[in-house]
Amino acid sequence: MGEWTILERLLEAAVQQHSTMIGRILLTVVVIFRILVVAIVGETVYDDEQTMFVCNTLQPGCNQACYDKAFPISHIRYWVFQIIMVCTPSLCFITYSVHQSSKQRERQYSTVFITLDKDKKREDNKIKNTTVNGVLQNSEFFTKEMQSDFLEVKEMQNSAARNSKMSKIRRQEGISRFYIIQVVFRNALEIGFLMGQYFLYGFKVPSMYECNRYPCVKMVECYVSRPTEKTVFLVFMFAVSGLCVILNLAELNHLGWRKIKTAVRGAQERRKSIYEIRNKDSPHRIGVPNFGRTQSSDSAYV
C-alpha cells in the first residue's frame, strides 16, 4: 500500500498547478476508483485465483495449462500494469515542469547577481567621486563615469526584466504544450488498455471453462472461484476506463485546441519579431563605410 501512496502524491503534484478542473476530477477517479479499489478490494477478490481454479482431472500440469488458457494474464496484474502505464505520461510531465522551474530560478539568480555587482561598482564610483585622499572632488570625469554606469545598470535591469518576462512566457507555453501531449498519450493508452481488456476477458467471467489443452488427455471442465464477484469487478473496471477516456476527451476539448492555437500563434509572432529585427539591422550593415582605403591613401594615387 505504501507504493500506491507514493504514486498518489506524485499524481497530485502533477495536477496541482497546471491542470484544469476536469484534470482534477480525473485524478480523483484514478486515485479512488482505480488505485484504492485495486489495492484494497482486488487483492482480496483475486487472492485465491489460481489455487481455487480446479479442473476435474488428475493429469499433472493440466490445471496450470487450462488456467493459462483461461487467463493469459491475471485481472489484477493487468490492471496494475494499466495504472502504471497510464500514470507514466503524468510522471514525465512532473519531471519536465520541475526541470523548467529550476532553470527559471537559475536565470533569476544569475540576473540578480549581475545587477548587484553593477550596483556595487556604481557605489564605489560614487565614493571615489566624493573624496580622493581626503579632498572633495566634483570633477566632470567622475560625474560622467557615474552617469554612464547608472545608465548601464538601469538598461541591464530593464533588459533583465524583459528577458525574464519572455522566458516565463516561453516556459508557460512549453509546459502547456507538454501537458496537452501527455493528455493525448494518456488517452491513447486508456483506449488501448480498454480494447485489450475486452479482447482478453470480455464482459463476463464464466463459472466453468472447457479445456483440451496439452497435457490434458481429454476435454476437461475447470471451475473458477467467485465468478459473479469477478464479473462485477470486471464490469466496474470497464466503466472506470470508459469514464477516464471521456474525461480525457473533455479535457482536450476544454483546453487542448485553444492552447494549441495560442501556442501556434505565439510561435508565429516570435518568428515575425525576429524577422523584423533582422530587417531593421540590415540597413545598418549595408551603410557601414569601407575603411579599407582612407582619404589619405586615395590621395597617394593622384
Swiss-Prot record:
Keyword Cell membrane annotated: yes
Keywords from the UniProt entry: Cell junction, Cell membrane, Gap junction, Membrane, Transmembrane, Transmembrane helix
GO molecular function: gap junction channel activity
Annotated disulfide bonds: none
Superkingdom assignment: Eukaryota
Topological domains, Extracellular: 43-75, 201-232
PROSITE patterns recorded: CONNEXINS_1, CONNEXINS_2
Job description of the protein: One gap junction consists of a cluster of closely packed pairs of transmembrane channels, the connexons, through which materials of low MW diffuse from one cell to a neighboring cell.
GO cellular component: connexin complex
Protein's UniProt name: Gap junction delta-2 protein
Family classification: Belongs to the connexin family. Delta-type subfamily.
Tissue specificity statement from the Swiss-Prot or TrEMBL entry: Retinal specific.
Segments traversing the membrane: 20-42, 76-98, 178-200, 233-255
One record GO biological process: cell-cell signaling
Description of how the protein assembles with itself and partners: A connexon is composed of a hexamer of connexins.
Annotated InterPro entries: Connexin, Connexin_CCC, Connexin_CS, Connexin_N, Connexin_N_sf
Main location: membrane
Topology relative to the membrane: Multi-pass membrane protein
Positions on the Cytoplasmic side per record topology: 1-19, 99-177, 256-302
PANTHER family according to UniProt: CONNEXIN, GAP JUNCTION DELTA-2 PROTEIN
Location relative to the cell: Cell membrane; Cell junction, Gap junction
